[in-house]
Amino acid sequence: MPYVGVGAQTVSTSLTGAPMVKAYIAIAASLIFVFCIAALGVHHSERKFNKFNKVSIDDIHKSDAGVIQDNIKTENIKKYLRIFTKDPHVAGTEANKKVAYEIANAWSEAGLEDVHTLPYEVLLSYPDFENPNSVIIKSSAGKEVFKSKGVSPVIIPDEQSGKYAGHQWLAYAGNGSASADVVYINHGTANDFKNLKLMGVDIKGKIALMRYGHGFRGDKIHKAQQAGAIGAILFSDTQDVAQDGVESENVYPKKIWMPNEGVQRGSLMHGDGDALSPYYPSKKELFKGRTIEEAKEDGVLPSIPVLPVSYTTGYEILKRLSGRPAPSDWQGFVGGNLTYKLGPGFVNGEKLSINVHSELRTKRIRNVIGYIRGSEEPDSYIMLGNHFDAWVYGSIDPNSGTAVLAEVARAMMQTINETSWKPARTIVFNAWDAEEFGLIGSTEFVEEFVNILQKRAVVYINMDCIQGNISLHVDTVPILEHAVIEASKQVENPSKRERSRGRKTLYDTWMKVFPDKKAGVPKIRVPGGGSDHAPFLNFAGVPVINFTFKNYTTWDTYPLYHTMYETPFSNIHLLDTDNLSVHKAIGQYWAELAKTFADDVILPMNTTHFASVMLKTYLPQLKTTISGINVSRSDFEDIRTQYALLSKSAQDLLTMSKKFQETIHFTQHSFSQNPYDPKHVNAVNERLKSTERCFINPRGVSMHNPSARHVLFSVSDSDSYSSSLMAGVQNAINSYDLNPTKKGLREIINQISIVQYSVICVVNTLRDVI
């Protein structure tokens, strides 16, 4: 019994196993005593309970966790990494199908149970690999003066020899060509478009030039198309991806910085999941609720041609732009001292055109699922996940995570086989397909099994990829913050330099590099979008943890993000040079979290902390937001009244959470006295599991994203990578600002009331009676 209380042995076995026989010999027990012990074991569990052994439950958990961590080996991670990144493997291709079955094979060989794939038929997008996309600049006389390559060059042939690996493209870009003046719009945020208009520059009928960073690329294109652009170009600025300079000695493969023809690929879909089957799983036998034309009309798929270019091509465009200089915070480092201008058009009458070759196709994708069944609560799921599809080789995103997850599975099964440890709750391993196109595999899975997940899933723990080598970085919901912090204290710091400075654990460096304003706490953000945790939290109300390793930098992600240069060379020689010690630490942290949630008697969920965050952080933020609404005094009083009622409910939640904490303490004490009577434990844990579900609004909180149903933490409408606190309230305020009507005012109040209803739901969930 993995989570038995004081009195359990550190190595528990079957009563008929060899270790048990040795124990009987060692203690020279009488036959009567043996009979009693055997009877007790048969009645209760295959795991022993010896009242003479004073080992505590914490000792047992720490010992088992230590064995699992010791069993995680870097040589295995390296082996898996090379297997999974041998070829380019875009979702929907035979190469990615092969990776799926290699993952399934690795998990099966490790000993996971019921390893299988789950297929879906989804709309994907591919370029014409025989005809690269291009940017062409012609003189006023019609002579071609510049043409982009459209293909990134091979730099390490042993790892980058796949056919078409260098092709530069963006999924779901509109097929076709566009010729027009160019307008520079910085990062393409909502404020950037607003400021461009204030500066008197019109984007209608133009080609938008935008930098990567500060938001999801699909949102940039969505805004550009809404503003009337007929095409768009995205480029990486050297101030983000080549900070040491663009010379060969300062970029890949000498350093981690992007080389001069590197390009970030990605998806432009505005939303998550299959574009043609919102709300429902995209199974072959089910009807598609939306057509391609409707998806374009709804803004889910772009209609205009779009392509990514290198900073070398970006320079060729920027140096020709006419018009007034861009604002200082719109300037970058492409071309060194080059001053970015807004346009429209070029100074010397030259003309630009873009040619994009893109095709939409329905393809089969497949998720991979495997289990370690729990010995006590097999219907309680601790879910671990990572996606495996990549834009090219994907050795960083995502297959650094894929390799680590395979090793976590192997190490756990090794521990099970060599000791008597087995998790109390079921650990589910998930490898998602087509994440890069818009979280498709995970979203379809959640849509298919949402009712089961809301009953069985305890937590979903996601690790997309390893982004740096300095510090752990964790996003999670407030109810899980204590758990992620405590787990980080149990894993040794992978950096020798950090350990020499007295920072022995992941927690120590995390606290140093990413401190919160609150003393003694590392910075933890609410999860946004951009990876497979999003549908679990936003659609199903399953609490999530999304973690990685990062550097303390000013750019959004690592410089080689979504380039063809993500091959094992980058992991081993540029990113994690001490024998993949960061990869190993990531695996140890993943395993520590999984084991904690699988084996802790009471689930490590803290509703008191959540209530405190609600009162001290979320409500003051909401108060500031509603104070800025332009309404009459009487109308504002109506809003303020509803806000006060929400505040009262949040205070009730804090009071009830403190009372519920007393119930938890009583339950833990009772369990330590009689670990074979878990009914009180089950009652407490069922309430804890249900709290996050209270915030799911079946009607949704976003018109644009059907996966957004969480009234507190749904993904932002303006940036799919970010979370939006109380998105329904914010969306109602935005709508009112555009069209101030009485109905719009009532909707603001209604959305505040919906948040209050969810808080009341948590209060009622924690009560003993209705």
UniProtKB/Swiss-Prot annotation:
Zn(2+) 1 binds at H387, D397, D464. It comes from Caenorhabditis elegans. It is an enzyme of class 3 (hydrolase). Residues 1-25 are cytoplasmic. GO terms for molecular function: carboxypeptidase activity; metal ion binding; metallocarboxypeptidase activity. The lineage of its organism: Eukaryota, Metazoa, Ecdysozoa, Nematoda, Chromadorea. Its EC number is 3.4.17.21. The chain crosses the membrane at residues 26-42. Its cofactor is Zn(2+). PANTHER family: GLUTAMATE CARBOXYPEPTIDASE 2 HOMOLOG, N-ACETYLATED-ALPHA-LINKED ACIDIC DIPEPTIDASE. This is Glutamate carboxypeptidase 2 homolog.
